[in-house]
């Protein structure tokens, strides 16, 4: 019990979490632009190995020194993975960046890749070695359990995903503002309908900014009243109609629905 409580404090409410040495450039947020280098220091690139090379596949968030939060659909049972931390341009050797192998993967037991709309698209990656925090590598905060963000709450998506449907993958980390769409709206006909569940968050839907292929698993960053950034969402779904489609906001796994699961996995592994 003591161990579980301690982990809950360290992971979900760490005193040093959610603060960046290099503050995000908020003036760049509205149009989906290149992020200020290392301004989202919990953002990681999840990469898989193929023929001796490493390739970006998804994003993720560092939530403890040995643990990364990502989406279950990013994981293949046969894959070999590593994460890149403290990186801005994925194709340039950068001072302060770090590559760490993934030693264990825990996918939520209720995730079903054949029934994606049921949700539970969440996984935890244990790193082979705990990482030291630096000005370029920091922990994300998790939101308090059960938190539901109000309609139009401004959050910010970050990642190395495609800039548009079938578009190119960027070299540099991108960022963009997404407004939360409440469940009542997002689950209505003409929006996502019954695809959306209460264990998800919708954000965007303006036809301009959204997540796209390669952003999956990455954070939906929302600022708390104390100024710290909390990861409220994990990139999960976009519309088959395209990445930037009206009334089809990006869908994220709602992290505040899984605090107990996250703490339990870390405590027992």
Curated annotation (Swiss-Prot):
Annotated function: Acts upon elastin.
Propeptide: 17-28
GO cellular component terms, A-Z: extracellular region; extracellular space
The family this protein is said to belong to: Belongs to the peptidase S1 family. Elastase subfamily.
Expression across tissues: Pancreas.
Organism, as annotated: Homo sapiens (Human)
Domain of life, per lineage: Eukaryota
PANTHER family: CHYMOTRYPSIN-LIKE ELASTASE FAMILY MEMBER (PTHR24257), CHYMOTRYPSIN-LIKE ELASTASE FAMILY MEMBER 2B (PTHR24257:SF19)
Record's keyword annotation contains tRNA processing: no
Known EC number: 3.4.21.71
GO aspect biological process, one term: proteolysis
Peptidase S1 domain: residues covered: 29-267
Key words of the record: Disulfide bond, Hydrolase, Protease, Secreted, Serine protease, Signal, Zymogen
Top enzyme category: hydrolase
Disulfide linkage: 58-74, 155-222, 186-202, 212-243
Protein name in the entry: Chymotrypsin-like elastase family member 2B
Predominant subcellular localization, coarse grouping: secreted
Subcellular locations according to the entry: Secreted
GO molecular function: serine-type endopeptidase activity
Signal peptide positions (record): 1-16
Pfam families noted in UniProt: Trypsin
């Amino acid at each position: 019990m003591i161990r579980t409580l301690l982990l809950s404090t360290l992971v979900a409410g760490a005193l040093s979490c959610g603060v960046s040495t290099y503050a995000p450039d908020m003036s760049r947020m509205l149009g989906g632009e290149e992020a200020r280098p290392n301004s989202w220091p919990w953002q990681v690139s999840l990469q898989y190995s193929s023929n001796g090379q490493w390739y970006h596949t998804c994003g993720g968030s560092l939530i403890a020194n040995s643990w990364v939060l990502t989406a279950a659909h990013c994981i293949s049972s046969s894959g070999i993975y590593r994460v890149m931390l403290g990186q801005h341009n994925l194709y340039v050797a950068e001072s302060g960046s770090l590559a760490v192998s993934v030693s264990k993967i825990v996918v939520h037991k209720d995730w079903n890749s054949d029934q994606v709309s049921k949700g539970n698209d969440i996984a935890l990656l244990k790193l082979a070695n705990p990482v030291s925090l630096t000005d370029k590598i920091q922990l994300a905060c998790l939101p308090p359990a059960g938190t539901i963000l109000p309609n139009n709450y401004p959050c910010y998506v970050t990642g190395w995903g495609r800039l548009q449907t079938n578009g190119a993958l960027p070299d540099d980390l991108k960022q963009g503002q997404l407004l939360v769409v409440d469940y009542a709206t997002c689950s209505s006909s003409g929006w996502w309908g019954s695809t959306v569940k209460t264990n998800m968050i919708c954000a965007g839907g303006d036809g301009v900014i959204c997540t796209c292929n390669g952003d999956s698993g990455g954070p939906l960053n929302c600022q708390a009243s104390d100024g710290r950034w909390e990861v409220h969402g994990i990139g999960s779904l976009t519309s088959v109609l395209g990445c930037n489609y009206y009334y089809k906001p990006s869908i994220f796994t709602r992290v505040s629905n899984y605090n107990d699961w996250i703490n339990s996995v870390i405590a027992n592994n």
